[in-house]
């Protein structure tokens, strides 16, 4: 029997570099799933991500693309924001109250008087790990702009070599297929002139 995929969410933090679009990536540790691969910040959706309250909600059309259940759609987005905060130190936040969750990461955000600013998220894509794999993810990918993030780049150390990398250069790094597909999708959008913060 194929393993049931776990819900997960990732966030591509983008910035307009001097020559081209850059994306925040880091390297997974040797013992991690996808060991030594370059990835975006992200991870499994936790139960606490359902309890946490955002400062602003997803744009309606984005929510509908994620799931017919608005609560489930929001939970994916909340997980992407939490994982990015844990792994990079950067938070897509606005003044708000996350509420009682019993989660260290959410409590940290709450102490700062911030909650996820979900209206700043755009949707990149969805991927499910093939049935033949031992570890499987049902993954949603979002993107947001660096200028909308607060905090200092650092994080828990789960990702090393954290850096903004020009997307063309990132394509040459060691990564799993789905990471590559999402980078290619961002390049397509850039070629089609999708709205950058400076435009």
Predicted regions and their residues:
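N-terminal leader/linker segments that precede catalytic domains of diphosphate-processing enzymes
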Residues: 1-199
């Amino acid at each position: 029997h194929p393993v049931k995929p776990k819900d997960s969410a990732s966030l591509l933090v983008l910035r307009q570099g001097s020559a081209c679009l850059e994306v925040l990536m880091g390297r997974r540790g040797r013992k991690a799933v996808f060991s030594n691969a370059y990835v975006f910040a992200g991870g499994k959706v936790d139960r606490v991500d359902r309890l946490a309250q955002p400062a602003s909600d997803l744009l309606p059309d984005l929510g509908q693309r994620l799931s017919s259940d608005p609560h489930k759609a929001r939970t994916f987005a909340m997980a992407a924001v939490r994982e990015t905060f844990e792994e990079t130190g950067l938070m897509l936040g606005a003044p708000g109250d996350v509420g009682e969750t019993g989660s260290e990461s959410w409590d940290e955000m709450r102490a700062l008087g911030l909650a996820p600013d979900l209206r700043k998220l755009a949707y990149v894509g969805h991927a499910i790990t093939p049935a033949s794999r031992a570890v499987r993810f049902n993954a949603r990918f979002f993107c947001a702009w660096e200028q909308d993030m607060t905090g200092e780049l650092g994080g828990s150390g789960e990702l090393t070599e954290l850096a903004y990398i020009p997307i063309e250069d990132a394509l040459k790094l060691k990564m799993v297929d789905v990471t590559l597909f999402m980078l290619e999708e961002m390049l397509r959008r850039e070629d089609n002139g999708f709205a950058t913060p400076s435009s």
